[in-house]
């Protein structure tokens, strides 16, 4: 995923929230994404762990014609 991609993020709520990637930082353990959300337009950092599906918080938004 890259800057300006539409994504969904897993938060403490039950539904995923939609946002846009503002920045990407790669680390040995995974990738951090700065994601702008409706309530947080300046962005919040989310970390996707490299080796754990449970540690994946940011995923590409799937458009209806891509399903």
Curated annotation (Swiss-Prot):
Family annotation (InterPro entries): Dextransucrase_DSRB
Family listed: Belongs to the DsrB family.
The protein's name in its UniProt record: Protein DsrB
């Amino acid at each position: 995923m890259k800057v300006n991609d539409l994504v969904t993020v897993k938060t403490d709520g039950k539904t995923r929230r939609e946002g846009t990637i503002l920045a990407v930082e790669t680390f040995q353990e995974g990738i951090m994404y700065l994601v702008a959300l409706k309530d947080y337009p300046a962005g919040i950092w989310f970390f996707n762990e490299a080796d754990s599906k449970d540690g994946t918080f940011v995923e590409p938004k799937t458009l209806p014609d891509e399903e």
